[in-house]
Amino acid sequence: MKSAPSEDRERALAVDILIESEAWGMLPEAEDIVRRAIAACPHPALLRSRGRAGWGRHRNAGVSVLLCDDATIAGLNGRWRGQHKPTNVLSFPAPPLQGAAPGEKIPLGDIALAYETLAREAEENGTTISHHLSHLVVHGLLHLLGYDHHMKDEAERMERLEREILAGIGVADPYAGCDADT
């Protein structure tokens, strides 16, 4: 059963964006792109997320997005994943909130994106920075919701959902012609 449009609006994710790197000034519409990509994620994806299935009774959920540079994301990657190098996107799911009252804001987690890596990958892949940013925001949000791509079937499910969400906002299939996982 599809929820009414007003219910969808009431359940929209709150998005907090911190622009930490001046490099993002090269893409002045970055905040709008992030918000649009997050808003494009359908509620069924949120409601059936592993470990977050009960969030549907809460009308307020939020995600924080850090728009940073390669140096910052390399530090985060080293600290939290033991990989001392830049990457395009990192997702940090919030731990499940115990005993949250209906109406209380539920933090889903944080997403960090590095401008230099994102811009380089966009050029290498022949896509726009805007489209690549949209893809990585959706990818990061799906990680916060419990989706992953370590196993082939998980990767296929996650990539299929990414394609559907991105198509809804006019972004071409980021996996067309690719064999590798993101």
Language-model features: where?
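Short active-site segment of divalent metal-dependent hydrolases/proteases
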Residues: 138, 142-146
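An acidic/histidine-cluster motif and surrounding catalytic segment
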Residues: 1-133, 145-182
